Amino acid sequence: MKNGKTCFGVIIGTRAYFNSELAKDVRKQLLKTLDEGGYEYIILPEDATPTGSSSIETREDGLKVSKQFREHRDEIDGIIVSLPNFGFEIGIINAISDADLNVPVLVQACDDENDKVDLDSRRDAFCGKISVCNNLYQYGIPFTDTTLHTYSIYDPLLKKDIDKFAAICRVVNGLRHCRLGQIGTRPLGFNTCRASEKLLQRSGITVVPADLSEILYAAQKIKDDDPKFIEMCNRTCNYAKVPDSYKEKLGLQAKFSVAVENWIEANDVQAVAIQCWDSLEQNYGCAPCVTMSMLSEKLIPAACETDLAGAVSMYALALASKNAPALLDWNNNFAEDRNKCVCTHCGNFPKQFVGNGDLKLGPLGVLGRTLGKINTFGAVYAKVSEGPFTFFRISTDDPKGQIKAYLGKGEITNDPYGMDGCIAVTKVDNLQKLMKYICKNGFEHHVAMCRTDVVDILNEAIETYLGWNLYVHE
């Protein structure tokens, strides 16, 4: 990141015996597209090489780029290679391999025009791109392709491909440097929420643990005149409707939220998994659902039941979409419609995911019957608005020593369903096939969702760069 924006290292490839004006035009239009998209970039000065236009050809040119890229290592999120003509693979591959940034790479090449293939106008980038990609493959450098093999630098596809690539960079870099909070142990009754810290760490995901008692002690020390506490009470009331009968519980809930947010900030955590039952209700007197909902709303995904892998799944969706994700149970069949099911949770969905402002706070439903309604206040009640969604789930498979995942998309319907908590009636094509895959491959009953289509983004990020075992549901 540079100045809070996604930053690309830009390489313009060329060959001296092609018209240098082709590279000049491509440089101008590519940088214009990046500027209009709100991106930062690192590129050689126009006069840095004999071919001009910031373009590179030889190994020596490539080493100038690699030196520049290394100087901006902490800023560059991905590398964009643009080929205005055939390009020269030697300069490009030396630039990328010597820089050794370990970031995603996008390779784009320009169309020839049928009436402009004379010696002054021809590009041959169609062929040159194959050579550049062959070199990347030889060097073991993973890369992303554009929608079409070649297209005009003025084609709207360029912006779409860059925006998609930026999202891929966010996912890859975000997960490789993620600090994942764990507040409390998993619930006693949920072996299904086990996860391997060591397998997560191998992908760059560091688990940062805290005992639940630390958070409860911090919450109990917060005074009623603490500005953060007063602000949290107001934020919560503005976020969801608080019934008059539970107003006295709002303070307890708000202090827990402040303690959690303070811990997250102090430990530089990007996502968190929380032990949401039943110690918190028995030893403190509230449920953490609205805390988790409000965290997810501001893109700090918070997973229930100390589901570490679920929190990672939510974070991946947040990075890909820049939208608030939710963690749901694949919970109920929907009558005898075998492509529909009810996805629900006690009450942790963020407002953006719900898609409407009709959120109300109350006690947990099932747990409220056993732990007492007064001790389980904090659940969000909401009916999710209809529309598309992406679903995603990772799991650490210890026997196989790998991280595995599944990915797909569906529709949330407007069907009524008489259940408390957060409710989403979903429709997924070939749902029975998906359920068989989940069961046969030992996945958990939790699934992460967001309200936009980011299947292609996650597919590319995982298969090309993260190397997890991925099933994409069709």
Explain the meaning of each model-derived region.
Residues 5-9, 113-231, 237-240:
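Cap/lid and interdomain-hinge subdomains that line or gate substrate/regulatory clefts
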Residues 28-29, 369-474:
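Extended hydrophobic packing segments that form well-structured cores
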Residues 31-52, 142-148, 206-211:
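Short beta-strand elements in bilobed, periplasmic/extracellular small-molecule ligand-binding domains
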Residues 54-74, 88, 252-259:
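Glycine-rich, highly charged phosphate/nucleotide-binding loops
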Residues 75-85, 104-108, 269-275:
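Periplasmic-binding protein-like
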Residues 231-235, 239-320:
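Long, internal scaffold/assembly segments composed of regular secondary structure
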Residues 299-417:
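C-terminal catalytic subdomain
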